[in-house]
């Protein structure tokens, strides 16, 4: 009895345990997010028509410190020969990639009043776009306030965790050709991430499949700090900001001498050297016009054609006055699935992130850029009116760097890669240079954020770099020429109704039309055979009936039989059935073929927006900076390399 009672107890306990487990499992499963949890079903202010396919939200990269990275993904509008994904990062460190999404290369631009317009030049034409706010704490990303990152290897590790989880959520993109692009301080982020991906690909003992990293694009990049620091004064001379041998020049040269000494004392191996950063600060001080009104006293460090208040460009670009309130709207926050753990509103740049991210244990990416060039093509591009990460510094870095068996622009001993003129739609656009897996593009009359000024030109650059050829798709390619020669036919958007999908639809319609004709003929033939058989049977029965009843009812018997068998009704029914069997008649096919076709991507007015023109000075007279978290010198640093 005791054993039986004990056994019964254990059975009861086991049943209870199983029941508890069963009730617990669904809650665990519910915690696992799926694609559907990230799907953006509506976006406030979006243009009329079908919404672009997009996903957005947070992915946890470190549970211990509540570290979550925010992403916003747009599916490509068209596919050329294969699938491609471009991962975009802005700089800072600590500046949101929503700058890229909403002011540069994303499909929408925010207008006054919070409505969105299509960006004629967005990069989602032939590539899926993945914008990520990183490091943690940047933009919509968040982390415990005592857990901000400090070094570039930490950032790369977080990005690898993010990508592993993201590709698990969206496996259909894992085999895409992958490109990583960005600007400014992303010149540090991108090579570190690329190196981590390449190392992962080589370690196939633990990782399931390699990621197809195909190229890197870096605009006005902070790659070689030493070359950039020593380029500030030459750039100022070239652009007439400071006159050589003037008192101003002598004061700046004195600060440059201090910088050179610091570089010789180990600064070449550092990402930031504060004594060298003071060179740019000194030039901005020397070029201030203290007699001008308050909003025009200082040069804009991001676009020297413009002037600003004493923040010297921190209020730029002007679209911030519309982007910031839009991204802080409750309905937008809800649409983008922003977690409730994100306690503060969106800000362009986070001073706390920048203040912690000093990269003291990191080497500048120029140190291993040559190694990357042996495995991955790299494109560097520069707006020629940017001061903070100017083209003079980038060109000095290239000339001083050795990779793939040569130094700088040397193709062979004594032979250098030519600088080729680039024209776009009949206007001088810049120059191209290519050598040993490196491409360098200079954009004329452009700022620190080149896509902000010339989205269509930058997408032409992207499509060339990705070797996109739209000859199999249709559409009207851009008139883009390097040294007078047209390259591959690449799209710049003005063909939403001329894609391969539309052509396939037209071909399918023609095939359906012929099938309908053929099917109609078959149906008619079958019906005629049936009618003939019935008619034969009818005649046989009629003759038989007539012979039996003739002389009794005269001809009335035949008439009554015709009516009684309902042959007239059968003919009418057969005619209706014929039309239904073929689904539609020729007139309906003609109407279908002549009906106007709507683009599958929902772009109704994508081509109406003209390319942005250079802004005048008054355009940039804005209010306070978007970041409320930093002041003084820290405020200057946090967006120093945005």
Curated annotation (Swiss-Prot):
Tree of life domain: Eukaryota
EC number: 3.4.16.6
InterPro entries in UniProt: AB_hydrolase_fold, Peptidase_S10, Ser_caboxypep_ser_AS
Chain segments carrying region Disordered: 476-500, 586-642
Compartment annotation: Golgi apparatus, trans-Golgi network membrane
One GO BP: apoptotic process
Name assigned to this protein: Pheromone-processing carboxypeptidase KEX1
Gene: KEX1
């Amino acid at each position: 009895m005791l054993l039986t009672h004990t056994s019964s107890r254990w059975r009861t306990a086991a049943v209870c345990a199983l029941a508890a487990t069963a009730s617990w499992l669904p809650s665990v499963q519910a915690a696992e997010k799926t694609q559907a949890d990230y799907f953006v079903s509506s976006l406030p202010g979006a243009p009329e028509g079908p919404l672009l396919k997009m996903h957005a939200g947070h992915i946890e990269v470190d549970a211990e410190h509540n570290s979550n990275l925010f992403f916003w993904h747009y599916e490509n509008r068209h596919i050329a020969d294969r699938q491609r994904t471009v991962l975009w990062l802005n700089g800072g460190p600590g500046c949101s990639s929503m700058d890229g999404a909403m002011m540069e290369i994303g499909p929408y631009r925010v207008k006054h009043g919070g409505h969105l317009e299509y960006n004629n030049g967005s990069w989602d034409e032939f590539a899926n776009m993945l914008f990520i706010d990183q490091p943690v704490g940047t933009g919509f990303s968040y982390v415990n306030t005592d857990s901000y990152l400090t070094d570039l290897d930490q950032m790369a590790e977080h990005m690898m965790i993010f990508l592993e989880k993201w590709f698990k959520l969206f496996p259909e993109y894992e085999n895409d050709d992958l490109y990583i692009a960005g600007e400014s301080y992303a010149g540090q982020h991108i090579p570190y991430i690329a190196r981590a991906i390449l190392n992962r690909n080589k370690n196939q003992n633990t990782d399931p499949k390699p990621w197809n990293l195909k190229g890197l694009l870096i605009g006005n990049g902070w790659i070689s700090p030493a070359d950039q620091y020593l380029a500030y004064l030459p750039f100022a001379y070239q652009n007439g900001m400071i006159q050589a041998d003037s008192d101003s020049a002598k004061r700046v040269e004195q600060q440059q001498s201090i910088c050179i000494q610091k570089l010789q004392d180990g600064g070449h191996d550092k990402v930031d050297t504060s004594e060298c950063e003071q060179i740019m600060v000194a030039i901005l001080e020397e070029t201030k016009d203290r007699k001008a009104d308050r909003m025009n006293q200082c040069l804009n460090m991001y676009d020297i054609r413009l002037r600003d208040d004493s923040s010297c460009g921190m209020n730029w670009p002007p679209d911030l006055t519309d982007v910031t309130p839009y991204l802080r709207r409750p309905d937008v926050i809800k649409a983008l699935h922003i977690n409730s753990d994100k306690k503060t509103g969106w800000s362009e740049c986070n001073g706390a992130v920048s203040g912690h991210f000093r990269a003291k244990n990191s080497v500048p990416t120029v140190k291993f850029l040559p190694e990357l060039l042996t495995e991955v093509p790299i494109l560097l591009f520069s707006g020629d009116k940017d001061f903070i990460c100017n083209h003079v510094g980038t060109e000095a870095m290239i000339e001083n760097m050795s990779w793939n068996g040569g130094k700088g622009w040397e193709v062979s001993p004594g032979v250098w890669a030519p600088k080729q003129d680039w024209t776009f739609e009949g206007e001088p656009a810049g120059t191209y240079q290519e050598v040993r897996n490196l491409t360098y593009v200079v954009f004329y009359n452009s700022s620190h954020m080149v896509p902000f000024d010339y989205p269509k030109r930058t997408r032409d650059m992207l499509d060339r770099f990705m070797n996109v050829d739209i000859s199999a798709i249709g559409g009207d390619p851009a008139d883009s020429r390097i040294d007078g020669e047209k390259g591959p036919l690449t799209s710049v958007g003005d063909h939403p109704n001329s894609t391969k999908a539309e052509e396939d639809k037209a071909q399918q319609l023609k095939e359906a039309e012929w099938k309908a004709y053929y099917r109609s003929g078959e149906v008619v033939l079958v019906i005629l055979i049936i009618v003939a058989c019935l008619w034969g049977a009818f005649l046989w029965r009629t003759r038989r009936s007539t012979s039996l009843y003739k002389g009794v009812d005269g001809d009335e018997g035949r008439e009554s039989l015709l009516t009684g068998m309902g042959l007239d009704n059968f003919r009418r029914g057969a005619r209706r059935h014929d039309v239904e069997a073929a689904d539609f008649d020729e007139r309906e096919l003609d109407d279908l073929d002549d009906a106007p076709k709507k683009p599958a991507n929902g772009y109704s007015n994508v081509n109406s927006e003209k390319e942005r023109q250079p802004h005048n000075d008054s355009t940039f007279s804005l209010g306070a900076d978007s970041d409320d978290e930093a002041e003084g010198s820290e405020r200057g640093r946090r967006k120093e390399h945005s």
